[in-house]
Amino acid sequence: MIKEHHKCLIIGAGPAGYTAAIYAARAELKPVMYVGMQPGGQLMDTTEVDNFPGYPKGVEGPQMMEDMRGQAERFGTDVRTGVATQVFFNESPKRVLIEDKAEITADTIIIATGATAKWLGLPSEERLKSGGVSACAVCDGFFYRKQEVAIVGAGDTACEEATYLSKICSKVTMLVRKDGFRASKAMVNRVMTTPNIEVLFNTETVEVLGAQTVEGVKIKNNQTNVESNLVVTGLFIAIGHTPNTDIFKGQIDLDENGYIKTIPGSTNTNIPGVFAAGDVQDHVYRQAVTAAGTGCMSALDAERWLAAQGPVSYTHLTLPTNREV
């Protein structure tokens, strides 16, 4: 097993990780990045990105991630394949295991492991992810201007995205599996008073219809078992995201949903020298540009933290008491 020590270790790739790498490399922190299971993050499944500055004609998600990686490498980032499988933040220096092939200690660690959208698990949904099925209304809603779409979900996020889509699309149909919402009263009221939003309760999505693009959704009333087809050109899944933080449980403070807690106005965590950027610490905005912004912040925070330490002296760090999330 390889054993190395570095000034800055970045765990995860994507807009947050690559931006952190660009800034850390330019600050001569000589960052090493392990890209994880999905190099590039959720954008690797995105065909068109039209809302990231600098791409006036839009760009495909994988191409954008390739551009970011190239920029990070140009400034000296050591980008490596590999998945972090265990962390030891109570040790000094902090230690990270990369599968069974590397043991990395680092003065600073930037966590940019992102979050994973929850999906329905339908084969037709997977097949049409690039053809009209999306987990981000803000990202992709514009493509369905003046069209009819459906959205699956019952919480605040689903209601918020339905309201957003109602301003763009001619009609939005919400498919709610149970007989009521899980959202706040204010969000429910907003949905129910929007004229072009229709809500179908006790409704399950059986299949996404269409060969190359979404042409409709087969739905079933779970009270009567009656199936019917709903004609739409886009289907938005808004049943939540799961932060990729399993390996950090018991090592760093997480909130009740598993997102890494950061000190407001910074990317600092409760562990000195450990920073978090992107969707792994953001369940509100979840945009490529905001992830990139926090990636920048994390590198600047790491640089300033190192400068404040002077010659690094390693002392024992206390683990958080809330080991279960």
Located regions from the model:
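Residue-level detector of alpha-helix initiation sites
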Residues: 14-15, 38, 115-117, 156-157, ...
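Conserved small/polar residues in nucleotide/adenosyl-binding loops
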Residues: 314-321
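Internal hydrophobic alpha-helix adjacent to the cofactor/substrate pocket in enzyme cavities
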Residues: 163, 291-311
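FAD-site-proximal beta/loop scaffold in flavoenzymes
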Residues: 116, 121, 126-143, 239-286, ...
